[in-house]
Amino acid sequence: MTDLRHYDVIVSPSITEKSTLVSEQNQVVFNVAKGASKPEIKAAVEALFGVKVTAVNTLVRKGKLKRFRGFAGKQKDVKKAIVTLADGQSIDVSTGL
């Protein structure tokens, strides 16, 4: 049984053109919680998907400034994790948990 905290760490898979390109290098991209650390992300991916993780790289994409009905606003910042899997391991993010 997986710990419920793992579901709070991994928010959603990031399915973009770049994330599908890095999947060829045995990497998967996830949107993660802002306060999540690399060891927490590694433990969550290994527990939820049953795979071996070799590396975790993180980045914070700053929210864009947008206008809505004449008022200036800002989109939220998003933290992403690029997870490198061990050789022979794979995750199908389209099926979900």
UniProtKB/Swiss-Prot annotation:
Gene3D superfamilies: 3.30.70.330
Entry-linked Pfam families: Ribosomal_L23
Keyword set, alphabetical order: Ribonucleoprotein, Ribosomal protein, RNA-binding, rRNA-binding
Highest rank taxon of the organism: Bacteria
Gene Ontology CC annotation, any one: ribosome
Family membership noted in the UniProt record: Belongs to the universal ribosomal protein uL23 family.
Function according to Swiss-Prot or TrEMBL: One of the early assembly proteins it binds 23S rRNA. One of the proteins that surrounds the polypeptide exit tunnel on the outside of the ribosome. Forms the main docking site for trigger factor binding to the ribosome.
HAMAP family for the chain: Ribosomal_uL23_B
Subunit structure: Part of the 50S ribosomal subunit. Contacts protein L29, and trigger factor when it is bound to the ribosome.
The protein, known as: Large ribosomal subunit protein uL23
Protein's organism: Rhizobium meliloti (strain 1021)
